[in-house]
């Protein structure tokens, strides 16, 4: 029989036992392509000459960076640590020097709003125990070839602190991970 839950009871049990859940093909290829293309457009529209904030999870130098700290309600761009931020790269190679875009894409960009604020995602959040799920933060994280920074082992709750713990991250792989595109 069909369950009223948006996920099966087996999936819910797996979530409860392991703290994560993999849902294959939750989003269509077209929906994923929309975000990939939109991220490229956002980068092309951005003038990076007056902004050079670097994001890396090892030294976490961004923790003292107001551009980063004040990004919760904005769309902001953060560079790879190994990116050469010269005039040529800031104009010609813009697509390959950005580490991530964050943190309010889900509130400020139509394509990301459509992807993030939908019934299915809300229902999954409710199925895993959230009574009134809210979107707090969104990021588009790049895996840049040859210069992509290391992401050290971490839990998102380290960065998004609530008491009691009440946050969960939804992570979407927009492309298949391969050796050619910087697999995880």
Language model: regions and residue ranges:
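Catalytic core of non-heme Fe(II) oxygenases with the double-stranded beta-helix
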Residues: 108, 122-126, 147-184
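Non-heme Fe(II)-dependent double-stranded beta-helix
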Residues: 1-17, 24-153
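Short aromatic/hydrophobic contact patches that present stacked aromatics
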Residues: 20-22, 171
């Amino acid at each position: 029989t069909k369950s009223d839950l948006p996920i099966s009871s087996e999936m819910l049990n797996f979530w409860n036992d392991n703290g994560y859940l993999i849902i294959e093909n939750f989003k269509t290829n077209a929906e994923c392509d929309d975000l990939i293309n939109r991220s490229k457009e956002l980068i092309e529209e951005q003038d990076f000459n007056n902004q050079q904030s670097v994001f890396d999870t090892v030294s976490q130098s961004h923790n003292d960076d107001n551009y980063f700290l004040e990004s919760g309600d904005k769309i902001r761009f953060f560079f790879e640590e190994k990116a050469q931020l010269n005039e040529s790269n800031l104009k010609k190679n813009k697509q390959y020097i950005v580490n991530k875009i964050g943190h309010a894409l889900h509130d400020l960009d139509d394509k990301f709003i459509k992807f993030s604020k939908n019934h299915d995602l809300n229902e999954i959040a409710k199925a895993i125990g959230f009574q009134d799920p809210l979107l707090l933060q969104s990021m588009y994280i790049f895996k840049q070839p040859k210069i992509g920074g290391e992401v050290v082992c971490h839990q998102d709750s380290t960065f998004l602190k609530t008491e009691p713990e009440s946050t969960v991250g939804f992570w979407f792989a927009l492309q298949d991970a391969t050796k050619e595109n910087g697999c995880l």
